[in-house]
């Protein structure tokens, strides 16, 4: 039997104390990416991390790569389009072969929600879920929390804040992970989407973006995940944007909290998810999320590999 090993497959794998530890460490790195201690660099310099991404990625894979390098570790990034999976090798066999090379950690992304949990059964090194189907994306939720933590100043200040998720909530692993994490921290949540993009949930829901904007201290826009839809829901993305785009006019007219902040996990469909002018607004935290992604993933890698 494989030895017990600490993985990060979903946010519930972490206690609240561990989340606080990660926030504190990541905040240090967000202030200065070079604030890695000599001791950490020395311990990380012989670590080899493998990234197995079976779905496309820009921010997540680059963020993990940069985080690894900033800590002093080495990272091997496989191109799955040219790997033996294209020759019919199964996911499990691919993983077992990479695992046999004894990396110090493996980061994986897959279209199946169950994939990381199945792989964890075979893993004797830390396994990090970088996105699985529609179910989980724990490091994205953690970096989003870091963004809120740094904006509002503390977890205590976050309690009671209202966040509205706008867009394809049903198919969003980002929303799923964020909702589970933020509920633990006492935030009030609303979901805003057309019926076909809403999950069955006890949470507050609305089909009206104006209602969501009026409700929220925090707006998180979500991409329409057309690759996960069985049939078109709107005639075009433009039609969807007419109903659900976060625009300056909607913010000016309906936001009760004029300091409402806007987040998006990316990739952003400009003028469909969020109006270009809003993306350039000081209330947009989208690029801060990207920066915080490197910092949080540095903290996660250090936590799993060294602590």
Swiss-Prot record:
Catalysed reactions, semicolon-separated: carbamoyl phosphate + L-aspartate = N-carbamoyl-L-aspartate + phosphate + H(+)
Domain of life: Bacteria
InterPro entries named among the record's database cross-references: Asp/Orn_carbamoyltranf_P-bd, Asp/Orn_carbamoylTrfase, Asp/Orn_carbamoylTrfase_sf, Asp_carbamoyltransf, Asp_carbamoyltransf_Asp/Orn-bd
GO cellular component: cytosol
Family matches, as Pfam families: OTCace (PF00185), OTCace_N (PF02729)
Residue numbers binding carbamoyl phosphate: 59-60, 109, 137, 140, 266-267
MF annotations from Gene Ontology: amino acid binding; aspartate carbamoyltransferase activity
UniProt keyword Signal present: no
Keywords from the named record: Pyrimidine biosynthesis, Transferase
Single GO biological process annotation from the record: 'de novo' pyrimidine nucleobase biosynthetic process
Transferase is among the record's keywords: yes
List of residues binding L-aspartate: 87, 173, 223
EC top class named in words: transferase
Catalytic activity, EC: 2.1.3.2
Pathway info: Pyrimidine metabolism; UMP biosynthesis via de novo pathway; (S)-dihydroorotate from bicarbonate: step 2/3
Description of how the protein assembles with itself and partners: Heterododecamer (2C3:3R2) of six catalytic PyrB chains organized as two trimers (C3), and six regulatory PyrI chains organized as three dimers (R2).
Annotated function: Catalyzes the condensation of carbamoyl phosphate and aspartate to form carbamoyl aspartate and inorganic phosphate, the committed step in the de novo pyrimidine nucleotide biosynthesis pathway.
Record family assignment: Belongs to the aspartate/ornithine carbamoyltransferase superfamily. ATCase family.
UniProt protein name: Aspartate carbamoyltransferase catalytic subunit
Record organism: Helicobacter pylori (strain J99 / ATCC 700824) (Campylobacter pylori J99)
Taxonomic placement: Bacteria, Pseudomonadati, Campylobacterota, Epsilonproteobacteria, Campylobacterales
